[in-house]
Regions:
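Short glycine/proline-enriched loop/turn "hinge" motifs that connect secondary-structure elements
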Residues: 9-10, 46-52, 123-127
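Broad gene-expression machinery/nucleic-acid interaction feature
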Residues: 12-16, 52-58, 101, 128-132
């Protein structure tokens, strides 16, 4: 966390991303099951959809002068603004393996219950220019059930009358 002690120990320009809040994005919650298909497009498993969480970060720049901090934050903002969505190919490990894009919001409207000034006060640090970065990320519940084998035979239909005779 960017506390006074942490700030006193740094000796080079630093961009710090401090995770200050985690909340489920209940608007994205889905019910039911999703089909997992193999390379032949055959359903091999069914799984619960992932749960989505809003991760809120306080992004700050730490240098010797305020002007350098502003320039560094400007560079961070210029890097993040065009990136409204991160595709699965750019996500690490199991997060990328889900095949879902991850939306980013930078310097958006503060909708969480705590203001950034309250966060700074709780950290015991001086108020600094910062960016609020919100990453909405899926959490894989890893609850998959194998699907039954696909039906490969054609259906057989036979008609009988009430007495069981086939002469219909």
């Amino acid at each position: 966390a960017p506390t006074r002690d942490w700030a006193a120990r740094r000796n080079a320009p630093v961009v710090n991303a401090y995770l200050y809040d985690i909340r489920e994005d209940v608007a994205r919650r889905q019910r039911g099951q999703m089909a997992v298909r193999d390379e032949d497009d055959i359903v091999v498993r069914r799984r619960q959809p992932p749960r989505w969480f809003r991760l809120s970060y306080l992004v700050t720049a730490w240098t010797k002068t305020p002007q350098d901090e502003h320039r560094l934050l400007s560079a961070v903002l210029a890097t993040l603004l065009p990136r409204e969505i991160m595709p699965p190919s750019e996500l690490p490990g199991s997060l990328g393996a889900l095949g879902l894009s991850v939306p980013l919001t930078v310097a958006g409207i503060q909708t969480e219950s705590r203001s950034l000034a309250e966060i700074w006060s709780a950290l015991g640090g001086e108020l600094k220019p910062s960016l609020d970065l919100v990453v909405v990320t899926p959490w894989d519940l890893d609850r998959a059930m194998p699907a039954a084998p696909p039906v490969t035979e054609r259906p057989r239909i036979s008609l009988h009358d009430r007495d069981g005779r086939d002469d219909l």
